[in-house]
């Protein structure tokens, strides 16, 4: 199960961003080549494990840039529309600015197209430090949006624990990946995420 994902992670080159070990992978970076079979395998497993249902989820909320392709395939499979938390300000009515800090960057994100009566599933490629998800989840809570589920493809580092401690939300992921001795290691996560 998830053979394509695991293989792509194990074959990922590792680079340093400051003190942060960063693996370069189609899921997290769009390079090397992102194969449609990999995206489909991921979306199929999200649907199988977490069962996003249009009766209980109004929108999928993904985070630019690497959450977009996962949300797109998931939207096609579930018929649930998605919105993108962007890195660019549009100035639309109701736009909410969010400050995010990760292990290797800092900046603003902008939420549009989400209202207080929405029920959403948040999806992203990876939770690592938890900084991006913390910022987005706290903003959604302030907007009085009902967060039904938080899903990432990959759990790396302590981010899921940090998100749980600070927001109460459980981040459910497909696999756990880490960098050990300059190589990516991959562990299965049981079906519950």
From Swiss-Prot:
Single GO cellular component term: cytoplasm
Compartments where found: Cytoplasm
PANTHER family, sorted: HYPOXANTHINE/GUANINE PHOSPHORIBOSYLTRANSFERASE, XANTHINE PHOSPHORIBOSYLTRANSFERASE
One Pfam entry name: Pribosyltran
Assembly information from the UniProt record: Homodimer.
Catalytic activity: IMP + diphosphate = hypoxanthine + 5-phospho-alpha-D-ribose 1-diphosphate; GMP + diphosphate = guanine + 5-phospho-alpha-D-ribose 1-diphosphate
Record-level Gene Ontology MF annotations: guanine phosphoribosyltransferase activity; hypoxanthine phosphoribosyltransferase activity
Full protein name: Hypoxanthine/guanine phosphoribosyltransferase
Comment on pH dependence: Optimum pH is 7.6-8.2.
């Amino acid at each position: 199960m998830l053979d394509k994902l695991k293989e792509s992670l194990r074959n990922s080159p590792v680079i340093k961003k400051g003190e942060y070990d960063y693996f370069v992978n189609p899921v997290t970076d769009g390079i090397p080549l992102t194969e449609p079979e990999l995206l489909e395998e991921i979306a199929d497993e999200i649907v199988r494990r977490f069962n996003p249902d249009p009766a209980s989820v109004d929108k999928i909320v993904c985070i630019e840039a690497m959450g977009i392709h996962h949300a797109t395939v998931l939207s096609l499979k579930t018929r649930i529309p998605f919105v993108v938390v962007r890195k660019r300000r549009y100035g639309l009515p109701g736009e909410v600015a969010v400050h995010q800090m990760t292990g290797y960057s800092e900046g603003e994100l902008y939420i549009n197209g989400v209202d207080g009566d929405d029920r959403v599933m948040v999806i992203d490629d990876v939770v690592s430090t938890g900084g991006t998800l913390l910022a987005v989840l706290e903003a959604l809570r302030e907007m009085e949006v009902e967060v039904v589920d938080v899903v990432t493809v990959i759990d790396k580092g302590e981010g899921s624990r940090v998100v749980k401690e600070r927001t109460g939300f459980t981040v459910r992921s497909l696999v756990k990946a880490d960098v050990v001795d300059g190589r990516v290691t991959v562990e299965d996560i049981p079906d519950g995420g």
